[in-house]
């Protein structure tokens, strides 16, 4: 099916979603499975950049959700000491052998988890981390230890997600658009970007920066307050602003624009990508 045909079939299935079960056959099942396969291969994305703006393929997100209704829970093996798990989403790596790994071209350290329908591009390094379904991780990115890439999140090229970073998903609670980290960004340890916020290209978030839709993002130089988006080339740290009753509330502060000194501290190490 073409993408336009898939979209029409997914939208029809979504309207009848209460009737969809693991026993469902026909066009609805075929469309959902084809969409999940396209997401898994990276030929389709939940969100794609068109010029300076991001376009969200809402129907692809709906297909991810419909996939939960089409599959029964089953035992997944491979746990410590012969343990198992109980889930309805397969691993991206299920049944992979040497040929599939070589063709994929990324590195996956033991104990990383990637669920089927997430795309991982060539040159990516996955430390013991979690990448949820529908996500897209582009070339040369490092997903460091205990980092989480949420459902349908979009991670650009040559991004570094430091240890314990959380990139929010869109499925629960439902968000209109995915969280997006554009190319060449560095996200410091234990930082969180959630609720469909966008970190624009080349930005650096220091350790422990938390950004959601209601987080004030303050430009220290101009005093401008913005929400939901970090401008390109920003260096951002955690801060606070005065509020009612003499209490300071958390905010994220743009302290400067990325310069040569910042790049030298946050550049990726090509030796780790070989």
Swiss-Prot record:
Metabolic or biological pathway: Amino-acid biosynthesis; L-lysine biosynthesis via DAP pathway; LL-2,6-diaminopimelate from (S)-tetrahydrodipicolinate (succinylase route): step 1/3
Keywords linked to the UniProt accession: Acyltransferase, Amino-acid biosynthesis, Cytoplasm, Diaminopimelate biosynthesis, Lysine biosynthesis, Repeat, Transferase
UniProt xrefs under CDD domains: LbH_THP_succinylT
Compartment(s): Cytoplasm
Pfam families given in the database record: Hexapep_2, THDPS_N_2
Record GO biological process: diaminopimelate biosynthetic process; lysine biosynthetic process via diaminopimelate
EC number(s) reported in the record: 2.3.1.117
GO (cellular component) term, any one: cytoplasm
Tree of life domain: Bacteria
Reactions performed catalytically: (S)-2,3,4,5-tetrahydrodipicolinate + succinyl-CoA + H2O = (S)-2-succinylamino-6-oxoheptanedioate + CoA
MF-aspect GO terms: 2,3,4,5-tetrahydropyridine-2,6-dicarboxylate N-succinyltransferase activity; nucleotidyltransferase activity
Entry binding sites for substrate: 107, 144
InterPro entries cross-referenced by the UniProt entry: DapD_Trfase_Hexpep_rpt_fam, Hexapep, Hexapep_transf_CS, THP_succinylTrfase_dom1, THP_succinylTrfase_N_sf, Trimer_LpxA-like_sf
Family: Belongs to the transferase hexapeptide repeat family.
NCBIfam families: dapD, PRK11830.1
UniProt subunit comment: Homotrimer.
The protein, known as: 2,3,4,5-tetrahydropyridine-2,6-dicarboxylate N-succinyltransferase
UniProt organism field: Cereibacter sphaeroides (strain ATCC 17025 / ATH 2.4.3)
